[in-house]
Amino acid sequence: MADIDNKRRALVTGGSGDLGGAICRRLAAAGAQVIVHANGNLARAQAVAAEIAAAGGSAQAVAFDVADGEATAAALDGLLADGPIQIVVNNAGVHDDAPMAGMDAARWRRVIDVSLHGFFHVTQPLLLPMARTRWGRIVSVSSVAAVLGNRGQTNYAAAKAALHGASKSLAREMASRGISVNVVAPGVIEGRMAGDAFPPELIRQTVPAARAGRPEEVAALVAFLCSDDAGYINGQVIGINGGMG
């Protein structure tokens, strides 16, 4: 396991979910001071933070809507009062699937507001404080749908694919400040979001590895990208999908 300096603070959006919780636990085990974010359910974020603390790690819980720029700015102002946040994992995201022919504008906007606008609302205010430390790691969690496309997910694929371009551009802007910006694009991962949509037979048909990935496998990759060992990996989209492409 790659170590992370125990003075570094890490914000994980969507940290109260299955994948986000695994990322929080892995970063804490590596040494980071973890800020576990929930979009609305603070109790779930507090439960993850308590689990980390019980294991000897450092964690706190916060809740704010990443789609709401003003609420996010206010929350981040409070967090930055305690010092810069040098690790950001943009993991918050939602599904609201429908064929585009039957998709209304609200459904389109909801997904993009969380995944894409949330990326901006969270990341932008943290950049200058991070740059002043001359070290930072920004990792956004995308999806194989952004690479391959997926029926019924034009909104989700569009939002996640936009993260690829934004991250590659931001990597060029921030690399000279010691900040890396990368994207992890998982395939089918065990958890509440995938359970109903991907029954075992469908997984065997669509995933060459014939199984769903585990949240801990994605978390291990994210934690590596947040470590000193990964400093020269920058502007990359890294798939973790059991061979889907």
Regions found by a protein language model. Name each.
Residues 143:
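Residue(s) in the substrate-gating loop at a strand-loop-helix junction
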Residues 123, 159, 167:
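Active-site helix of classical SDR
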